[in-house]
Amino acid sequence: RRSSSAASDVYKRQSLDITDKNLVIRVDMNVPLKDSEVLDATRIKACLPSIEHALSNNARILLISHLGRPSEGNFEEKFSLQPVAEYISNLFNEKCELINSLESKDIFNGKFNVQLLENIRFFEGEKSNSAKLGKILASLGDIYVFDAFGTAHREQASTHSAIEQANI
């Protein structure tokens, strides 16, 4: 089943064949941290149904999220998603690899089923809804999935431009 929307076609999770596909999933894992520990995992746990559905279909996953409000284009350790990657690793009892670069040859290299892109707000063009960044994000996998309802109101590269430019 699919319905038409202004930006692109919208597919229901159960209707799309994701078997053995590379999925880029925009999630909302903007969680509170203290001393590199996740204080409240509610938003991470909200993403579990999509992650589990993908893994049960032998899909590989690259998660994209933001954390806090870093200066765009600059790495700030206090906004790193490393603690979130560690939390996900513990949840699934397998390593969730943190990816630091969009050019990384490690993306979907077959070594890890779940990967997490470093804080999307570290990348130039996220907040300005850069079409260039959106195109790069959309091209990283076979399917771009939006599962970040809490960020749906933001017109940013990972929540808007990537969706417009994704094939599926």
Residue ranges and their predicted role:
Residues S8-I168:
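Active-site loop-to-helix "anion-binding N-cap" substructures in soluble metabolic enzymes
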